[in-house]
């Protein structure tokens, strides 16, 4: 597939997601990184977003709950170039009814080449990066070229 470049802004659009068993862990991480998060645009699946906003006071645009389609809503935003980073504390030891949605969200994040943290260590590396607050060029699929080749 042909590639093109997209410039991520200095103020990133960051999606925050956590499975039920990892919501307390994500909340702790968000509290630890609240100062950094305040300068970015935050999105989350419904239950997670409402909990984080209530507990931290951060402005978070909440989708609907993950099992009800929130993961897919975030995936759509990623494919539209409206999400720059995904912090997803998923539970690798428990299956959830919407596992196919989870896999689709992680797949679409990979397709559109956005940074993804699935645990605290990776989230720490991303948030310690000097690129967090800078414009960053990333290669993404050239959808227009893809479409032209298929029609």
From Swiss-Prot:
Tell me which SMART domains the record gives: MGS
Q: Which reaction does it catalyse?
A: dihydroxyacetone phosphate = methylglyoxal + phosphate
On the tree of life, the source organism's domain of life is Bacteria
Entry's PROSITE patterns?
Answer: METHYLGLYOXAL_SYNTH, MGS
Q: Which residues form the MGS-like domain?
A: 6-151
Biological process, per Gene Ontology: methylglyoxal biosynthetic process
Could you tell me the keywords of this UniProt record? Lyase
Active-site residues (renumbered): 71 (proton donor/acceptor)
Q: Give GO MF terms, alphabetically.
A: methylglyoxal synthase activity
* EC number assigned by the record: 4.2.3.3
Entry binding sites for substrate = 19, 23, 45-48, 65-66, 98
A GO cellular component annotation here is: cytosol
Q: What does this protein do?
A: Catalyzes the formation of methylglyoxal from dihydroxyacetone phosphate.
Q: What is this protein called?
A: Methylglyoxal synthase
Q: What is the lineage of its organism?
A: Bacteria, Pseudomonadati, Pseudomonadota, Gammaproteobacteria, Vibrionales
């Amino acid at each position: 597939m042909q590639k093109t470049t997209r410039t991520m802004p200095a103020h990133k659009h960051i999606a925050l997601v956590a499975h039920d068993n990892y919501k307390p862990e994500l909340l702790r991480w968000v509290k630890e990184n609240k100062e950094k998060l305040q300068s970015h645009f935050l999105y989350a699946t419904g239950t997670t977003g409402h909990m984080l906003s209530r507990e931290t006071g951060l402005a978070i645009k909440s989708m609907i709950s993950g099992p009800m389609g929130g993961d897919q809503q975030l995936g759509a935003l990623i494919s539209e170039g409206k999400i720059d980073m995904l912090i997803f504390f998923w539970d690798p030891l428990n299956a959830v009814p919407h596992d196919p949605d989870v896999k689709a969200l992680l797949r679409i994040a990979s397709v559109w080449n956005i940074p993804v943290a699935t645990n605290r260590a990776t989230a720490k590396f991303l948030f310690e990066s000097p690129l967090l607050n800078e414009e960053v060029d990333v290669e993404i699929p050239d959808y227009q070229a893809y479409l032209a080749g298929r029609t």
